[in-house]
């Protein structure tokens, strides 16, 4: 999924009017950070506030804090519109979307372009996404570009389906086993 983000001064002000969740590359529990109008100027106050509240994990100038904060707000808002469809993700967009889903189960289809069983599962996976509106359905092309994420998630065969809840992997289905996938999703929905 390629996310296009266009920010004007007004959109920055709107997205930064309320608290945001800070970016944490280690994916530890998110921290709340308040940014105000000083961030619009890229002033030192915003950068200082960000460093004081978040600590050394985030090394950014005030202006880049604004952009990152606005991006995170956009990703959080976008995760609400992900229901009812399958969304293509990559190594940069997967974790923000998965963590932004809150209590909704997230199902990640890890596939390759050349995989026959992956192609068989794709329309069935799409039907599930249209039917189960309380679940976020994602797919990741396990190409060279996304290899670091595939390795992090422990993929060994394609297709592999990872089921996450609360940003943590709760189940895995390997191969084109549709019935097992449905059962794993139902278990995640009811937990």
UniProtKB/Swiss-Prot annotation:
The record marks 109 as: Deprotonates C-terminal active site Cys. Signal peptide: none annotated. Its main location: plastid. The record marks 116-117 as: Contributes to redox potential value. Keywords: Chloroplast, Disulfide bond, Electron transport, Plastid, Redox-active center, Transit peptide, Transport. Residues 68-190 form the Thioredoxin domain. Forms a complex with heterodimeric ferredoxin-thioredoxin reductase (FTR) and ferredoxin. This is Thioredoxin F-type, chloroplastic.
């Amino acid at each position: 999924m390629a996310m296009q983000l266009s920010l004007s001064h007004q959109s920055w002000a709107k997205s930064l009017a309320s608290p945001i969740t800070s970016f944490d590359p280690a994916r530890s529990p998110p921290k709340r950070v308040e940014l105000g109008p000083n961030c619009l100027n890229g002033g030192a106050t915003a950068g200082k506030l960000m460093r004081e509240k978040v600590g050394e994990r985030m090394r950014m100038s005030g202006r880049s804090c604004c952009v990152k904060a606005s991006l995170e707000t956009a990703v959080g808002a976008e995760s609400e519109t992900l229901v009812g469809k399958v969304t293509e993700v990559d190594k940069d967009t997967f974790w923000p979307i998965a963590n932004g889903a809150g209590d909704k189960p997230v199902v990640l289809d890890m596939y390759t372009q050349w995989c026959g069983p992956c192609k068989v599962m794709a329309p069935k996976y799409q039907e599930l996404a249209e039917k189960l509106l309380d679940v976020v359905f994602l797919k990741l092309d396990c190409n060279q570009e996304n290899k670091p994420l595939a390795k992090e998630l422990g993929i060994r065969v394609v297709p592999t389906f990872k089921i996450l809840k609360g940003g943590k992997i709760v189940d895995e289905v390997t191969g084109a086993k549709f019935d097992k996938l449905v059962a794993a999703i139902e278990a995640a929905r009811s937990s």
